[in-house]
């Protein structure tokens, strides 16, 4: 079946399934409508005489009235709320049970007796809110005892839109966390940065810990979002230092869903499904065929013999399509005696908006939590597996489609079946090898597939010692195994086989295999003891982790003959750790935390191998003081102060401190006599390379007002990173290569983070919640090398190709600051082609670095924010999520790479141009001018979701929810390109994220 036909078949099949459910519901509703009037009449006759007006007053333990307390007749939807004086009136029957609840207080139930005496109900403060535990490194801590900057996010099942990857659930949700979503390719992971990252070219990804297993900082797209119970984001050093050498960029702890722990043994099932339709809603503005012919005649420098074609082809329309997708998840949760369990499976099939792009994922997970020896031994077993089948496409196809001549056809036949029926550039000598290939042929002829198998699991033992139950011994054994098998094949005679390095039409088969093994062992003891008003929670442990990989790749022709030498690589890394933490609190009012971790990494030499990472933090629960005891406005107020050090050991090479050698490939061997000899090339190295060390100061406030109807956090931090790791050029002859990874400088960062949660409305039928966060971050490089001046900088921000660097790291500037030529303009504001303002103010045509200037503008966003709101009425709900950034800049490299020269190039082919080129009238590509540097400010409405829930369909356990959502609704921005939300700030060949419409079903039974 054709791909489009198959997609529509899947879509129709899902629609039929959903319609079946709706038909079943409709039948049930008809039956209910027939029966309910009769039941209502009987009930009214039997109960009307017993209905009485129940009056009451709700107050707290100090006698103050509670506003907005919910009073509900148990088992019904009949209820009311208390007024500003704490009073309420409700009609109820004798023996009805009233359920009284209020945020921040323990609920209470009362039976209606028929007495005329008004009820006086006193609700006690809910201390369990303080006793709620949050997950931290190597353990848990009471929420009220937290001294560091962390936030736990639980996925909102009613307001999440379409979440294909795990990081989608965090976008715009946490202050200080900036997530740039991946490209429009399905399954592409986003870039996560906590507090902008603490390094330059070393790894800036946060450490990801899944159920106690620190995983490699690769994409977490293999994790099923439906299996995730919570994310805990650790931001300051007091909570991240326990992870030592990998925590400079923050930590994200992912906890997956577990089995029932409430004693319910009967299994419960949950099924969710959705169908999606997506499309690109914005294309690059290029010339149509008729407009192109006019521009070509006016501006192209082509010989008279060169003729345009007769076609009218919109090449962007030819490569894009409507993308269909579906997602199914089924889970079973229950308990067998003392063993809670959860089993789940999930399947995702998502087409990309580029033709032939498809992503499929199969997930399965098993979680067991048995207890033995009178619950003294707790065992937690988690196994997660996934198989990903990705059919990727080259994003260069987008640029090729934008620039391909619109007067040329998509298909054309040539002698000898050259081109396999697709149009290609030809001259009298045959195919033009310097021309770009037909983008449609690349999409339809290429056979690309990336298959990834991954399993993450662990077994954690928690033994509470008999007779000394305050002491627990913990053992955690975990693994993260991954296998990749990729291939990229192109048949003989394909147009792509006549361009670039492939010039004779020979087919190509590229194969890549990669194995990764990450194993760990953690053993630690935990001592928890309450001494009247004093509480101690102490932990000490040992950790061992091994990282190993082995890969090889080959490139052959279609007959299996090697076109290049096979390449092999294998390496391993060890991490050895000792760590400890002490939490102390007095009256749950004054808290102190101290941690220390020592890490040894085999990445470094024995002289610099060990790193020591301490931290200390204190907190004060101000609202528990006597002077706030009678305050009815402040319900929570805690001050936090912390200091700590963390490290960075994630550099490019496993053996950067050693002198290593690489065997030459076949094409680089030497002939001595009659025999070819393999040579060995030395690699660059730095024997003195050492840890990057980051120290952070943090001051924070946790607040809550009006029974926590208003709550949130405020944090301010200052951070300094010493011995920055960066890849730099070195003087010729000083090392075996011209670039090495080494310690070159320091960087200072600071920021303000504000989070707020509001419940403006909460009544019997209505509830409106709102959450928002705002972040201000700034980073400045304070030391870069032994000599720091304007001429000493590190180039970065490569736009592609040799020497096309658009950004620099420089002392006194934000990382990734643009370093460009200052464009000259005429008196009408029109840019002068090839004219720039030199540093002395004169006009120059030279594009040398000496004429470039530090713009003071960076791709790093100093300000970003997120907004989320949900409105519910009875069983209806409406949710909206959005996020945005401002203060950063984007270089429109797509526009900078367009000029009149492209109309007819030196390679003898014609190319299309952007409409903006007619405005600036540049005759050549001007890829280093600040004319194309634009503000990237934007606000994106991520999703709008509306749903309806049907409770108690055929029993109390059964519910059904239908929802409709729009993902990537719109982006408000003044940027002229497709999308300003780019991690590196350089807009080139982007695969834009589609606008997606989703119909979803959730069934619980």
Task: Label every model-predicted segment.
Residues 71, 100, 208, 584, ...:
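Short aromatic-centered micro-motifs
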Residues 158, 204-205, 323-326, 360-362, ...:
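Extracellular/periplasmic, surface-exposed regions of secreted and cell-surface proteins
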Residues 270-310, 655-656, 742, 761-859, ...:
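Conserved small-residue
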Residues 2, 8-386, 394, 426, ...:
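Short, small/polar-rich motifs associated with maturation and membrane association
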Residues 316, 440, 601, 883-967:
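Extracytoplasmic gating/loop element in the C-terminal half of outer-membrane beta-barrel translocons
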Residues 858-891:
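Glycine-rich, aromatic-lined ligand/substrate-binding cores of catalytic
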Residues 63, 86, 416, 429-430, ...:
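Detector for glycine-centered tight turns/loop "hinges" at secondary-structure junctions
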Residues 153, 167-173, 739-748, 790-818, ...:
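C-terminal extracellular loops and terminal segments
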């Amino acid at each position: 079946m054709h791909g489009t036909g198959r997609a529509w078949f899947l879509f129709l099949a899902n629609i039929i399934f959903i319609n079946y459910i709706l038909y079943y519901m409709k039948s049930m509703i008809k039956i209910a409508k027939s029966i309910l009037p009769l039941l209502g009449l009987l009930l009214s006759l039997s109960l009307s005489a017993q209905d009485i007006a129940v009056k009451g007053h709700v107050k707290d333990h100090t006698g103050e009235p509670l506003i907005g307390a919910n009073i509900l007749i148990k088992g019904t939807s009949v209820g009311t709320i208390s007024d500003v004086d704490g009073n309420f009136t409700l009609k109820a029957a004798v023996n009805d049970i009233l359920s009284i609840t209020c945020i921040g207080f323990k609920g209470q139930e009362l039976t209606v007796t028929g007495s005329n005496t008004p009820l006086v109900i006193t609700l006690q403060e809910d201390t369990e809110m303080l006793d709620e535990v949050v997950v931290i490194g190597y353990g848990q801590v009471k929420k009220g005892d937290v001294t560091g900057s962390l936030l736990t996010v639980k996925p909102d099942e009613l307001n999440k839109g379409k979440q294909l990857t795990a990081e989608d659930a965090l976008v715009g949700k946490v202050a200080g966390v900036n997530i740039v979503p991946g490209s429009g390719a399905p399954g592409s992971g986003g870039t996560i940065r906590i507090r902008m990252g603490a390094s330059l070219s070393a790894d800036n990804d946060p450490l990801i810990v899944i159920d106690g297993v620190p995983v490699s900082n690769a994409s977490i797209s293999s994790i099923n979002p439906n299996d995730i119970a919570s994310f805990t984001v650790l931001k300051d050093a007091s909570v991240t230092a326990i992870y030592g050498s990998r925590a400079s960029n923050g930590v994200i702890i992912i906890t997956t869903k577990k089995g029932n722990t409430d004693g319910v043994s009967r299994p419960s099932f949950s099924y969710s499904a959705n169908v999606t339709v997506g499309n690109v809603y914005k294309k690059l503005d290029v010339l149509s065929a008729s407009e192109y012919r006019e521009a070509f005649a006016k501006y192209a420098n082509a010989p008279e013999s060169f003729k345009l074609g007769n076609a009218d082809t919109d090449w962007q329309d030819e490569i894009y399509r409507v993308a269909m997708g579906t997602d199914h998840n089924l889970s079973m949760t229950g308990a067998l005696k003392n063993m809670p369990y959860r089993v789940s499976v999930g399947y995702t099939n998502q087409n990309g908006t580029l033709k032939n792009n498809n992503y499929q994922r199969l997930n399965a997970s098993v979680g067991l939590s048995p207890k033995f020896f009178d619950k003294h031994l707790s065992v937690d077993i988690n196994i997660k597996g996934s198989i990903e089948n990705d059919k990727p496409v080259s994003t260069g196809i987008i640029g090729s489609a934008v620039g391909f001549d619109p007067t040329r056809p998509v298909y054309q036949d040539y002698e000898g079946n050259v081109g396999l029926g697709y149009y290609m550039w030809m001259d009298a000598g045959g195919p033009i090898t310097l021309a770009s290939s037909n983008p449609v042929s690349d999409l339809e002829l290429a056979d690309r597939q990336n298959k990834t198998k991954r399993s993450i699991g662990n077994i954690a033992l928690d033994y509470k010692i008999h007779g000394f139950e305050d002491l627990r011994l913990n053992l955690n054994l975990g693994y993260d195994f991954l296998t990749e098998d990729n291939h990229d094949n192109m048949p003989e005679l394909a147009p792509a086989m006549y361009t670039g390095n492939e010039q004779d039409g020979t087919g190509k088969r590229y194969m890549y295999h990669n194995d990764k093994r990450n194993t760990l062992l953690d053993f630690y003891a935990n001592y928890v003891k309450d001494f009247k008003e004093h509480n101690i929670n102490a932990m000490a442990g040992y950790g061992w982790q091994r990282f190993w990989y082995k890969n090889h790749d080959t490139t052959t022709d279609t007959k299996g003959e090697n076109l290049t030498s096979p390449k092999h690589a294998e390496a391993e890394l060890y991490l050895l750790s000792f760590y400890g933490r002490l939490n102390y609190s007095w009256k749950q009012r004054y808290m102190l935390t101290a941690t220390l971790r020592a890490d040894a990494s085999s990445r470094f030499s024995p002289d610099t191998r060990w790193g020591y990472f301490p931290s200390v933090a204190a907190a004060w629960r101000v609202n528990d003081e006597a002077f706030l005891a009678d305050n009815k406005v402040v319900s929570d107020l805690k001050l936090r102060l912390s200091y700590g050090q963390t490290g960075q050991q994630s550099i490019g090479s496993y053996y950067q401190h050693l002198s290593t050698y690489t065997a030459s490939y076949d094409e680089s061997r030497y002939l001595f006599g009659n025999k070819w000899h393999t040579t060995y090339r030395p690699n660059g190295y730095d024997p003195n390379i050492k840890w990057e060390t980051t120290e952070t100061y943090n001051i924070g406030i946790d607040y809550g007002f009006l029974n926590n109807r208003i709550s949130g956090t405020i944090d301010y931090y200052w951070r300094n990173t010493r011995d920055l790791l960066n890849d730099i050029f070195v003087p010729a002859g000083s090392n075996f290569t011209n670039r090495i990874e080494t310690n070159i400088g320091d960087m200072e960062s600071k920021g303000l983070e504000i989070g707020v949660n509001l419940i403006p409305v909460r009544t019997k039928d209505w509830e409106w919640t709102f959450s928002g966060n705002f972040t201000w971050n700034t980073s400045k490089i304070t030391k870069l090398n032994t000599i720091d001046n304007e001429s000493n900088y590190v180039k970065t921000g490569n736009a592609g190709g040799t020497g096309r660097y658009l950004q620099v790291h420089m002392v006194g500037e934000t990382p990734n600051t643009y370093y460009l030529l200052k464009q000259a303009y005429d008196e009408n504001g029109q840019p002068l082609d090839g004219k720039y303002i030199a540093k002395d103010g004169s006009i120059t045509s030279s594009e040398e670095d000496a004429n470039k200037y530090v713009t003071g503008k960076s791709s790093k966003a100093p300000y970003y924010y997120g907004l989320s709101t949900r409105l519910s009425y009875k069983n209806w709900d409406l949710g909206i999520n959005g996020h945005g950034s401002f203060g950063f800049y984007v270089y429109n490299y797509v526009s900078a790479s367009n000029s009149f020269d492209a109309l007819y190039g030196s390679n003898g082919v014609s190319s299309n141009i952007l409409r903006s080129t007619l405005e600036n009238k540049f005759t050549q590509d001007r890829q280093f001018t600040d004319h194309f540097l634009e503000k990237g400010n934007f606000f994106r409405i991520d999703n709008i979701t509306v749903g309806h829930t049907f409770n108690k369909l055929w029993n109390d356990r059964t519910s059904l929810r239908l929802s409709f959502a729009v993902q990537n609704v719109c982006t408000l921005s003044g940027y002229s390109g497709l999308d300003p939300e780019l991690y590196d700030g350089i807009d080139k060949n982007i695969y834009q994220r589609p606008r997606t419409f989703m119909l979803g079903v959730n069934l619980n039974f």
